[in-house]
Amino acid sequence: MANIVRSFMAERILKGKLEKINRKDVDVSSAGLIDMDGMPADPIAAGILNDHGFEGSNHHAQLLTEDMASRADMIIVMEDIHRKMMIEQYPDAAGRISLLKSFSRDYNEAYGDIRDPYKLSMYHYRLCFSEIYLSIDGLIKCI
């Protein structure tokens, strides 16, 4: 929601996986629904990315703008509440908004959210990374 943990991790994982398969035609960025005014990425999230071979440095939170939403071919969110907020704020984008976990092989609508690990245990950060990582495999098949 603030673009310092989940969306940041998803952006970096997606960019890394697309680079490995030489998909240079896809532009990936992340933004939050709360203005954190350039706050750096959560250091635990950045460390987990680095540990798995993804770029974890040089990220600062940015707020999603109307221009970003209107230009995006796909808008991927982490929780259903985010999807609902986005549809309310950007109704023209409704058909382009999806839950990241809906691309997962094991998707179950009842458990479609990727929970925010911010300020929780390392276990929660690792679980979040795993859910994002596996969901992105499915997302790439749809791009």
Give, region by region, the residue ranges found by the protein language model:
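Short secondary-structure boundary segments
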Residues: 8, 79-80
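Conserved active-site segments centered on acidic
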Residues: 1-72, 141-143
